[in-house]
Structure formats: structure tokens, C-alpha cells
Regions:
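Patatin-like phospholipase
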Residues: 1-37, 45-284
């Protein structure tokens, strides 16, 4: 049986996902393939490496460290989140990522990135996070506060621009079961953003600008589609039981802990239903 898992992004809202995934680990929930977007990728790799609480731990420990994120870094490098410290020193030295366990896992992991030259989403298979750290940077490279990331000659930004919730990744491949972890409550719909700043910053990339301008439509259409599939029993959706009000790059440790703990609480609430969904062999 093929079980797919979709992980929405959302910057620090992604700690909700981290909490849910830690409940998955506690209950030995295994999936065949994962597709992550932005923070969904960054935090989701810890599920495959079987490192509960790591995503919460390194964020709580370093979010207020100027080496992790600072205006100085943004002015100097174009990255508000410091590349060398956050993506290299932390996972390689300070809070070591279990790269061996990840590579030995039977679960395949795909990172969603946005090709800024054609505006399309691409799904890059992550087989070795240590060697593919630039791809992990690319999936979470937020517009305006991140430099454009080049991987194998292609230019990328945050995967959520082109495909915030890539459920179609699994639909096209006829997976038996699809699990979706969202970081917004059921009532949330994205509003239109001003397009002036998009055109100013990225005038060389018209396809990217078009995606940014229409992102709210694409997002809302996907949410409606997921609701319909959920009603039909074709997907299992996990979403926050309350609105998550943290800022994208929240620095309040208490709030970060709350988001993670909400994920744990909501994960425990649905876990038995999830087990039943996965084990059910009837019509999809």
C-alpha cells in the first residue's frame, strides 16, 4: 500500500507539523513518500531521521541568536536567516541531524521548490540532506528576505509560491492513501496581496511575479479541493484546532512552544482515526 504525506509550509507555524509528526513517531506511523513545502520540508526531515523534538529544540535554542537570523545578515548577504550558521553549523555541529538514519529510511522525501524562471513547482528528491542543503534552503527561501538559490544551474525560491499544498503530487500517481498536514485552521482563506512590490523586486522574472500575484487564488482553490476530497474519504487531513497567530519568524519562545504543543495535542486527538484510515482496505 502506498501512503503519501503532504506537509504544508508556513514558517514558524510549521512547528505545529513538527508536533504532529512527533506523535506519528510515537505511534510508529510509517508512510511511503513525503512531499514537503518550505518549513514542512525543513521540519519534516526530522520525522524521517527519527529525531523527535529536534525542530522545536534548535529553533527555541537559536531563534534569538543573531548568528541564526539578523538584519545584519540580510543587509550583508540578502538572507535574513543566516546561511552558514543556520543551515550548516546547526545541523552539522550544534544540533546534529541524523543524516545516516535519513539515508537508510525506506521513505522517499521530496522538497517543493519554485523555479523562478518559469514559475513552476519542481519536486526534488532528497536522498542526502547534508549534500542537498542548498535544496533545503531553496524550498524555504522566502521572497524579499532571501537570496535566489541556484541548484544545478536552476534558480529557485520558496516552494509555496508555486504550490503551497502539493496534493496533486500524489493524486497523479494514484496513491492508496493521502495524509495532509495543514498549518491553518479550516476557516482560513488567503487574501490578495499587493503586486507592486512583486514587480519591483522580481521584474526580471515575469512568470514568478504572475505566480506571486495569483498565489491567493491557487491556495484557496487547493483548500476547497482538499475539503471535497476529505468529504469523500479520499484524504485524511490534520489541521490546527485553533488559529495559529505566530509571526512568520516568531521569536517569542513561549509562543513557539505553544504551536508545537498544539501539534502534539491535535496529533494525539486524531491518531486512532488515522490508524483506522491507513489500515482500511475498502474503496478509496
Amino acid at each position: 500500500m502506498k501512503v503519501g504525506l503532504v506537509l504544508e509550509g508556513g514558517a514558524m507555524r510549521g512547528l505545529f507539523t513538527a508536533g504532529v509528526l512527533d506523535v506519528f513517531l510515537e505511534n510508529n506511523i510509517d508512510v511511503t513518500d513525503i512531499v514537503g513545502v518550505s518549513a514542512g520540508t525543513l521540519f519534516g526531515v526530522n520525522y524521517v531521521s527519527k529525531q523527535p523534538k529536534r525542530a522545536l529544540r534548535y529553533n527555541v535554542n537559536y531563534i534569538n541568536d543573531k548568528r541564526y537570523m539578523s538584519l545584519k545578515s540580510w543587509i550583508k548577504t540578502g538572507n535574513l536567516i543566516n546561511k552558514d550558521f543556520t543551515y550548516y553549523k546547526v545541523p552539522f555541529q550544534l544540533d546534529v541531524f541524523d543524516n545516516i538514519t535519513f539515508k537508510e529510511s525506506k521513505t522517499s522525501f521530496y522538497a517543493t521548490v519554485t523555479n523562478i524562471e518559469n514559475g513552476e513547482a519542481e519536486f526534488i528528491k532528497i536522498t542526502d540532506p547534508y549534500k542537498q542543503m542548498e535544496t533545503l534552503r531553496a524550498t524555504s527561501a522566502l521572497p524579499f528576505i532571501s537570496e535566489i538559490i541556484e541548484v544545478d544551474g536552476k534558480k529557485y525560491l520558496d516552494g509555496g509560491i508555486a504550490n503551497s499544498i502539493p496534493i496533486d503530487f500524489f493524486e497523479k500517481k494514484n496513491y492508496d492513501k493521502i495524509i495532509v498536514i495543514l498549518t491553518r485552521p479550516i476557516s482560513y482563506r488567503k487574501k490578495k496581496s499587493t503586486s507592486i512590490q512583486f514587480k519591483m523586486f522580481y521584474k526580471k522574472y515575469p512568470h514568478l511575479v504572475e505566480k506571486l500575484e495569483n498565489r491567493y487564488k491557487d491556495y484557496n482553490e487547493t483548500v476547497e479541493k482538499i475539503l471535497e476530497l476529505e468529504k469523500q474519504g479520499k484524504v485524511f487531513v490534520i489541521r490546527p484546532s485553533e488559529d495559529i497567530t505566530v509571526k512568520r519568524l516568531e521569536k517569542d519562545i513561549e509562543k513557539l512552544n505553544h504551536v508545537y504543543n498544539l501539534g502534539v495535542k491535535d496529533g494525539k486527538h486524531i491518531i486512532e482515526n488515522l490508524k483506522e484510515y491507513i489500515s482500511y482496505k475498502g474503496e478509496k
